[in-house]
């Protein structure tokens, strides 16, 4: 049996949507964490392990790649997910030359993926460690994205490695990767606001307790 190449990715995205709809609070945050976690582990993790199998960039368009007919068993084959990066290598050549920094961060994505799923549980249960873990995860995601963008500039390889086509550059390179900078910034701000609010409550409670303890007792 054959399916279109985009089907496994669409099913995973739909699964994240369905699960997030059953959550009582912060549905968008839960969706982002689930979707991000799956991408970190299934896509980027697969590339990290099998980067050596991606040796050249694809010559077809993204639409043609997604509409290719592939065997159904590819849906759970990490080698196939790694091979999808031959398409992305068309926009960022580093994925076709096993760039050490890219491969390293793809292995780090496995940690991020696990943290995403753990954070989903913390969000649902409103666990005390939620915002500490959220800041930790967002820091790693943001740092990885910054390194992704600046290293071609640092080594003067941007024109050689990154597509010069405006659409491919701004949609596939800047747009897609920029999500892992923009959303972590938003979630980090959310965490700082929540932590500050909790400190204010504790401080207010402490002051009230001290005031009551100092209040003279009436006979």
From Swiss-Prot:
One of its GO terms (biological process) is sterol biosynthetic process. GO terms for molecular function: C-8 sterol isomerase activity; cholestenol delta-isomerase activity; steroid Delta-isomerase activity. It is found in: Endoplasmic reticulum membrane. It catalyses: lathosterol = 5alpha-cholest-8-en-3beta-ol; zymosterol = 5alpha-cholesta-7,24-dien-3beta-ol. Its EC number is 5.3.3.5. It is an enzyme of class 5 (isomerase). The keyword Transit peptide does not apply. Pathway: Steroid biosynthesis; cholesterol biosynthesis. It holds the Pfam family EBP. The chain crosses the membrane at residues 3-23, 30-50, 101-121, 135-155, 169-189. Catalyzes the conversion of Delta(8)-sterols to their corresponding Delta(7)-isomers. This is Probable 3-beta-hydroxysteroid-Delta(8),Delta(7)-isomerase. It comes from Dictyostelium discoideum.
């Amino acid at each position: 049996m054959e399916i279109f190449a985009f089907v496994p990715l669409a099913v995973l995205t739909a699964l994240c949507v369905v699960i997030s709809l059953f959550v009582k609070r912060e549905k968008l945050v839960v969706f982002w964490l689930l979707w991000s976690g799956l991408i970190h582990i299934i896509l980027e993790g697969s590339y990290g392990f099998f980067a050596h199998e991606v040796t050249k960039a694809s010559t077809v368009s993204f639409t043609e790649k997604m509409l290719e007919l592939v065997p159904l068993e590819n849906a759970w084959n990490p080698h196939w997910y790694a091979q999808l990066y031959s398409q992305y290598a068309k926009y960022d050549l580093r994925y076709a030359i096993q760039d050490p920094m890219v491969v390293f961060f793809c292995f780090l994505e496995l940690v991020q993926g696990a943290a995403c799923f753990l954070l989903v549980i913390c969000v649902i249960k409103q666990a005390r460690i939620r915002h500490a873990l959220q800041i930790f995860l967002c820091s790693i995601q943001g740092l990885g994205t910054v390194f992704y963008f600046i290293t071609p500039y640092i080594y003067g390889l941007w024109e050689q490695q990154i597509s010069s086509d405006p659409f491919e550059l701004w949609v596939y390179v800047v747009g897609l990767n920029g999500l892992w900078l923009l959303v972590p910034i938003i979630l980090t701000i959310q965490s700082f606001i929540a932590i500050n609010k909790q400190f204010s409550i504790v401080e207010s409670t402490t002051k009230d307790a001290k005031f009551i303890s100092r209040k003279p007792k009436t006979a």
